[in-house]
């Protein structure tokens, strides 16, 4: 009896210790406390809450693969738990993370050579989260993040299209521009995609398609001015594509259940 009481006290103290460390943003130490709590008391009073908070702690400690693995484990163990939406949400965020500095470096590099797969994975994971939990308290932020990711994916396709144009691979450029219009609609890149189509069709002699896309551009983007296609100030691109979603994001901890 006394041993059982002692074990419960140890469990409670470990969890309290983890909470203090999380509150103080000492994420490395919090991870140690939460991992210890989970391993020593896998079926204890705080086990499921600790598992959810561990996802958060890994994420805040920039251990994004560990955050995704922990989220997937939580989903598999607790498919109907009140925190399962949180696990899906963090899993999506952890697939592709950055800040304003990284975003700027992204645009400093050759977009046609960048690995866009993490952004695509994040977009797909967040899409799954929203399809499962459209009314989740985390849904609003997930939708904002998906707008940002859609813009980033569209910019990548435009970068590849321009890469092809520089090498006179106009069919490839047309394919990338069409992909933006058909699969990544309603982004700031749509007029640039149309502009690329107009230029490519003009070069290869497809006058009818050139005129059709020019008319679409004029009707839908009357204020758009194309100067040598995509000659833009870098800060302007960052502001247009990020919608202020970069930097300063406050990712919430899972609520106590």
Language-model features, listed with the residues they occupy:
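Acidic, polar-rich low-complexity tracts and alpha-helical solenoid repeat scaffolds
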Residues: 1-257
């Amino acid at each position: 009896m006394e041993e059982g009481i002692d074990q419960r006290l140890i469990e409670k103290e470990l969890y309290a210790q983890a909470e203090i460390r999380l509150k103080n943003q000492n994420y490395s130490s919090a991870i140690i406390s939460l991992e210890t709590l989970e391993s020593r008391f896998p079926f204890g009073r705080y086990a499921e809450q600790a598992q959810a908070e561990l996802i958060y702690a890994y994420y805040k400690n920039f251990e994004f693969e560990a955050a995704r693995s922990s989220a997937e484990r939580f989903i598999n163990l607790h498919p109907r738990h009140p925190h399962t939406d949180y696990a899906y949400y963090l899993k999506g965020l952890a697939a592709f993370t950055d800040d304003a500095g990284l975003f700027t470096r992204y645009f400093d590099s050759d977009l046609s050579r960048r690995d866009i797969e993490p952004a695509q994975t994040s977009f797909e994971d967040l899409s799954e989260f929203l399809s499962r939990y459209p009314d989740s308290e985390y849904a609003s932020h997930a939708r904002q993040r998906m707008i940002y990711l859609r813009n980033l994916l569209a910019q990548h396709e435009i970068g590849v299209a321009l890469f092809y144009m520089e090498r006179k691979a106009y069919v490839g450029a047309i394919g990338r521009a069409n992909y933006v219009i058909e699969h990544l609609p309603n982004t700031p890149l749509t007029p640039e995609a149309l502009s690329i189509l107009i230029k490519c069709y003009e070069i290869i002699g497809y006058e009818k398609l050139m005129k059709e896309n020019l008319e679409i551009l004029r009707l839908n983007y009357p204020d758009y001015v194309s100067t040598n296609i995509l000659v833009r100030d870098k800060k302007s691109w960052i502001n247009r594509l990020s919608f202020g979603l970069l930097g300063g994001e406050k990712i919430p901890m899972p609520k106590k259940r």
